[in-house]
Amino acid sequence: MNSSTALAHISEDGLRVQTVAEHLQSTAKLCEHFANVFGAEQAGCYAGLLHDIGKYSAAFQYRLKGGPKVDHSTAGAKEAQLRGQPYIAFTVAGHHTGLPDGGTRSDTDAEGTFLGRMKRKIDPYSRWESEIALPPSPALPPFKQRYELAFYTRMLYSCLVDADYLDTEAFMDDTPPPRGGGMTVFLLSYKS
């Protein structure tokens, strides 16, 4: 592993590393698997691939060496938003802090709302484009009611949070990530 490789995680003993690309790909596979239950596997994969691209920034790499905390989720949310995926953007933006309030166009970049965060200037993270190939943007299912869209976003969010947590936990424990578990097992048992 060369010194310019972007890292997502370092084991507590400092002997093992997980690259950002490895983490994004593993999380994407898990999120795709979980989201398949409600027909959103493409969106799950997309969210998993984008969720931590902010870890490619120099500021985050410095964080791994003891630097200050850094917002690494806004980068992926911005990329999803630029690609016409606002529901994935909400999901990615909140994968550590909870789904953000939407906000208003008058929100400033200092505010924690979704629209405020989309105005933030963030550290460059473009190295992701040479390591991660995004699939075509997923189509949004045809929703008849607004609550369906809200429910879809919350389900996708849950899939991403679980996938991210499970992949990170598996790396830290040096075990393969589990397939399913928790709410996924519950949903699969009731799938018609």
What annotation goes with each model-predicted range?
Residues 1-191:
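Accessory nucleic-acid engagement/destabilization modules that flank
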